[in-house]
Amino acid sequence: MADQQALLAWGAVGVPLALLGVLGVEVWLAANAEYLPDEPGYVLESRVAPASGAADGPEVRLVVLGDSTAAGVGAPTLAESLPVQVAQRLADDLGRPVDMTGLGVSGARTIDVRDEQIPMLVDRGVDAVLIVIGSNDVTHATSPSAMAEQTRGMLRAARRNAGEAAIVLGGIPLFGSADALAQPLRLLVDTYASVLRRVQRDTAAEEGVCFVNIAVEASPRFAGVPEAMSSDGFHPAPVGYGFWADALAPALAAELGS
């Protein structure tokens, strides 16, 4: 019933308002966001060792897929980006070096990860795949049925192309700290995000893939911490990405150890 009410609210006013509002936001973000280069073919690459300096065990090959959060938007340096922060925490948790490759693309939706990023896993010999996706599905009003189909296809393709690699799906965050979205747009976006987030969670469970609920495990930590958001008011800053990494890295470590 809650999902139906959310969909009715979104369908009545949310879709047209969101499409107009987000269009203006995206134009502004393009001119003001701080981010690492993301032109076609740009890849984030970093090899990190445990902070203790003592590495015991073989290198972990981690690939991070997804949207702007996986592409470095909001992070002035590579070391502060979400993929590298996750890799560093994973190295610390496992006591092993981590070789991280980030293939995220700003603006990507679930269907883009499925069709354009997942195929790049072939022959990479990866140990772990982290997918952080869904925010652009919210702002572009992907329907719940399409979200379920595309998420399922994405996870199955990841399983086929990544072999025995551990796979973790990071879910849609809360938009409560995204000051770039004025009210009531922010409320409408957050309402619809909750619908698609449940689709992600349920589909991941059906496919036997670990789901990390960023909205529950990380987003609440942004409250009262303005430095957690980047200057564009939409993407996390390094501090905020640290909150995300605190939730994502333990899940990867657990999957690698299972």
Where are these regions (language model features)?
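Conserved SGNH/GDSL esterase-like catalytic core that processes O-acyl groups on lipids
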Residues: R61-V63, T69-E149
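Aromatic/hydrophobic pocket-lining residues that form π-stacking "cages" and hydrophobic walls in ligand
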Residues: A87, M154, Q200
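A short helix->loop->beta-strand "cap" motif at the edges of active sites that frequently abuts
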Residues: A162-A166
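Alpha/beta-hydrolase-fold catalytic nucleophile elbow
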Residues: V132, G170-G171
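Residue-level recognition of beta-strand->loop/alpha-helix junctions
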Residues: G102-G104, G171, N213-V216
